[in-house]
Amino acid sequence: ETQWNNMHRPCALYMDTTKNDPVCFIGELGPGFGVNKEAPNLGNRVDIYDKKGKRLARLGDIHAGEKAGQFIAPHGLAIDSRGDIYVGEVSWTIMGQHLKPPRELRSLQKLKKLN
């Protein structure tokens, strides 16, 4: 049994148990409230952990956005048989409705595994 620390607003979880050592993917939200808006090292990201809670990788950027390597609000995760990662995002509620003018944003992205 272990306790995993140093996560900010985890909102998505996928446990890959297809290998001998399970890997856990966790989607985190970035700062969105006045109380944490200026806090350092928070970001909209996907972290990958081993079964003991050691972070193996971090995907994403400190800033939310639609550019390559950025997330808006990861809320759903899935991994296919090739190892590609699918990230579902709550982009309208978190960001799109607040833009001037409001607009639709990406709500699903695929991250292709490179061999």
Task: Give the location of each predicted region.
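Eukaryotic scaffold repeat domains enriched in small/polar residues
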Residues: 1-115
